[in-house]
Amino acid sequence: MGNTHTIKKINFEDMQIAIKTPEVYLIINTLPTTEQSCLIHNTINISQEESIINKYIKENTAIQLVIYGKHCNDETTHKKYQQLVTIGFTNVCIYTGGMFEWLLLQNIFDENLFPTSKKEFDILAYKPPSTFMIPLLHNS
C-alpha cells in the first residue's frame, strides 16, 4: 500500500523506565531554549545534544532515543523524530504526554516517581493551546 513508517509512541510508564536506565536510553526534549530550566530527569542538556548525537551517529545508531516536547500537541517532536530517523537512527520513539503530562503526574503522585530537574509550580504554562477557543473566520 505504500512505504509508510509508523512513529513509535510511549507512555509515562515507559518514560519512567527510560529515566532509570540512561545507559540504554538517550532522552531528548524539543522545548524552546528559553524553557530548559525544568526537564524530565536524565534529559540530555540542550547545549550537549548535538555533540552527543554526532557521537552516536558514528558509534551506535541503534541506541534507544526518546523524544518529548511541551505537551501532547507539540509538533516539534515529530520534526525531531523525522530528523533523527533521516540521519540514520533506528530506535526512536516519542513520549507524547510531554512535560505537561509529566508535571501533572508529578503533582498528583510524587516527584520521586516523576522526577524533574527542578520543581515547576506553573504547570499550566505547559498545557496545549485550545483549538476551540481560537476565533474562526465566518462568512458575513
Segments (PLM) and residue ranges:
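Rhodanese-like catalytic fold shared by cysteine-dependent sulfurtransferases
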Residues: 2-17, 21-25, 30-66, 71-140
